[in-house]
């Protein structure tokens, strides 16, 4: 029997199919690599914004869990040059700016620790619900919000199933309630969330024990001091020691981490993942890590 060549059309279809398989595999690998499952965090913090504003904090190594109770009636400081803004109108700001990561930066700044994920309605509205002594832990509703197409979130599908599992296995009594720290505005008497007071009251609550034990000293080099102060609070809130804030001698557009060791440490890995920093090896002037804040991150955290 004579051998027949496969039609060129078949080669084309096989090529397309192969490309699709590779692309799907790449997307799946990236989702797994960036997920909380792969990163193996000591603690995961999630902000739920909506009719009630709460932050859930899951202790994955110590099994100590927190629920941070927040009020829509208070004003909050929003990084990015927005200054004070009513909590209940935060969703409107996100919609106007078309930048949902404002939620992540805002809640991270509030608790002086890195908030990994956020969940918020896509359709913005103004919320007015006050703080409560015992915030409700409605696990079915929380899990539903994770998968609802009417909500926006920075979780991938693997994260959603993992976080849903964490929520499902915990009860109301498994959480320690952390209360808002409020100060009064001297001019109009408005309630303002005090980041300073909250940090003083709950310092160390959100530490990653692995980062604390690694004990790497970090220096932050900046061109914008206000951004450096905010970021240093968030980084220290993870258990990383910030030894110094200094004016930068480099102009960079993207955050850069300089480390002496060619092997990436857990501290370097955390900062790089959390703030999208590049990594380089070089002299670090007596500390373990130097973080050069670039224009991009400074404008976001100002």
Where are these regions (language model features)?
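Non-catalytic, solvent-exposed segments at the cell envelope interface
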Residues: 2-302
């Amino acid at each position: 029997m004579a051998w027949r060549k496969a039609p060129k059309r078949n080669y084309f279809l096989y090529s397309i199919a192969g490309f699709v398989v590779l692309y799907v595999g790449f997307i799946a690998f990236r989702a797994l690599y960036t997920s909380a499952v792969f990163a193996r965090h000591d603690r995961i913090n999630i902000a739920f914004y909506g009719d009630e504003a709460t932050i859930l904090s899951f202790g994955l190594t110590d099994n100590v869990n927190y629920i941070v109770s927040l009020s829509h009636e208070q004003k909050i400081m929003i990084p990015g040059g927005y200054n004070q803004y009513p909590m209940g109108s935060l969703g409107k700001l996100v919609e106007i700016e078309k930048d949902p990561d404002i939620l992540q930066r805002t809640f991270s700044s509030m608790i002086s620790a890195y908030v990994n994920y956020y969940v918020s309605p896509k359709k913005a509205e103004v919320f007015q619900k006050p703080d409560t002594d015992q915030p409700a832990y409605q696990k079915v509703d929380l899990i539903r919000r994770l998968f609802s197409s009417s909500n926006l979130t920075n979780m991938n599908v693997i994260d959603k199933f993992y976080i849903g599992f964490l929520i499902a296995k915990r009860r109301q009594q498994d959480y320690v309630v952390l209360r808002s720290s409020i100060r009064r505005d001297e001019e109009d008497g408005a309630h303002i969330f005090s980041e300073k007071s909250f940090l003083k009251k709950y310092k160390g609550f959100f530490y990653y024990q692995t980062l604390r034990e690694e004990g790497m000293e970090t220096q932050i080099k900046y061109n914008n001091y206000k951004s450096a102060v905010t970021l240093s609070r968030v980084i220290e809130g993870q258990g990383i020691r910030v030894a110094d804030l200094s004016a930068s001698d480099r102009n960079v557009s993207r955050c850069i981490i300089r480390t002496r060791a060619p092997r990436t440490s857990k501290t370097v890995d955390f900062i790089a993942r959390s703030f999208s920093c590049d990594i380089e090896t070089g002299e670090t002037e007596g500390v373990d890590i130097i973080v050069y804040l670039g224009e991009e991150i400074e404008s976001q955290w100002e």
